[in-house]
């Protein structure tokens, strides 16, 4: 399996490269970075002190032409450009980018009719098992409990709330028979009045090098339940992305997420 990495000089990109290089069953076939990036032309393994023979490139079509899969944890505009190129080269996609709007998500769905795509807000096995716990908890705490989602990430993260927090909200809202857009409240300030018990609240923290912390609070009278997942390293995301690649080996097209990959449906 020949795998290319987008955003190859970034924190997640480097972790993906290292994880691919350490897996004897897959091969690093390309490393994409933005035009003008200082790392262009360097060996993709230079940051590890390794020579891979794969040079950092901004030529999307050339990289994907020699790749079976592209793992993309970048930004929405870049990912959409990569999708268009992947359709030209018949390359399958593992997408961990967050911050897409509804129209952009529709483009991903359309692309999945022609190639296999795993699209998820979080590739950690632990986070995806947590999603099932939240679904179960929401059904049992549907009355008399206020629901709040608190997430924390590093200072460089550009979107808030995180894609994972929003997915958690969607899972909870779905379990309660609601739509998230109808019940979400994003942060609070000033005189807000009493809390509407039908809402799901979100709070986002940005600071330091926090990889990703998510806590869902079910607050009742006399008790509260907290379900928390904390990521100490991006390695769990990279390992999950490789599981997604292996899952796509048996799917020529279609849109999937990590619940499909892990058999949690």
UniProtKB/Swiss-Prot annotation:
Its main location: cytoplasm. One of its GO terms (cellular component) is cytosol. InterPro entries: DapB_C, DapB_N, DapB_N_CS, DHDPR_bac, NAD(P)-bd_dom_sf. NAD(+) binds at residues 7-12, 33, 96-98, 120-123. It catalyses: (S)-2,3,4,5-tetrahydrodipicolinate + NAD(+) + H2O = (2S,4S)-4-hydroxy-2,3,4,5-tetrahydrodipicolinate + NADH + H(+); (S)-2,3,4,5-tetrahydrodipicolinate + NADP(+) + H2O = (2S,4S)-4-hydroxy-2,3,4,5-tetrahydrodipicolinate + NADPH + H(+). The active site is at residues 153, 157. It comes from the Bacteria. Coiled coil: none annotated. (S)-2,3,4,5-tetrahydrodipicolinate binds at residues 154, 163-164. The keyword Amino-acid biosynthesis applies. NADP(+) binds at residue 34. Keywords: Amino-acid biosynthesis, Cytoplasm, Diaminopimelate biosynthesis, Lysine biosynthesis, NAD, NADP, Oxidoreductase. One of its GO terms (biological process) is diaminopimelate biosynthetic process. It is found in: Cytoplasm. Pathway: Amino-acid biosynthesis; L-lysine biosynthesis via DAP pathway; (S)-tetrahydrodipicolinate from L-aspartate: step 4/4. Its EC number is 1.17.1.8. Catalyzes the conversion of 4-hydroxy-tetrahydrodipicolinate (HTPA) to tetrahydrodipicolinate. This is 4-hydroxy-tetrahydrodipicolinate reductase. It comes from Paraburkholderia phymatum (strain DSM 17167 / CIP 108236 / LMG 21445 / STM815) (Burkholderia phymatum).
């Amino acid at each position: 399996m020949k795998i290319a990495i987008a955003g190859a000089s970034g924190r997640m990109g480097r972790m993906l490269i290292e994880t691919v290089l350490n897996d004897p069953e897959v091969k690093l076939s390309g490393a994409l970075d933005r035009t003008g990036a200082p790392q262009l032309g360097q060996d993709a393994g230079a940051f590890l002190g390794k020579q891979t023979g794969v040079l950092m490139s901004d030529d999307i079509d050339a990289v994907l032409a020699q790749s079976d899969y592209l793992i993309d944890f970048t930004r929405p505009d870049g990912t959409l450009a990569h999708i268009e190129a992947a359709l030209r080269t018949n390359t399958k996609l593992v997408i961990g980018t967050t911050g897409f709007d509804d129209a952009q998500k529709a483009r991903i769905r359309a692309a999945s009719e022609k190639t296999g795509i795993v699209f998820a807000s979080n590739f950690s096995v632990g986070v995806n098992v947590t999603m099932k716990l939240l679904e179960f908890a929401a059904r049992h705490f549907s009355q008399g409990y206020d629901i709040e989602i608190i997430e924390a990430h590093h200072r460089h993260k550009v979107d808030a709330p995180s894609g994972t927090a929003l997915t958690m909200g969607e899972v909870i809202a779905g379990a309660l028979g609601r739509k998230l857009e109808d019940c979400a409240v994003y942060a609070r300030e000033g005189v807000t009045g009493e809390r509407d018990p039908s809402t799901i609240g979100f709070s986002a923290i940005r600071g330091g090098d926090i990889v990703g912390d998510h806590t869902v609070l079910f607050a009742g009278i006399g008790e509260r339940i907290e379900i928390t997942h904390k990521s100490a390293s991006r390695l769990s995301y990279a390992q999950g992305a490789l599981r997604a690649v292996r899952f796509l080996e048996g799917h020529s097209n279609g849109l999937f997420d990590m619940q499909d990959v892990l058999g949690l449906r």
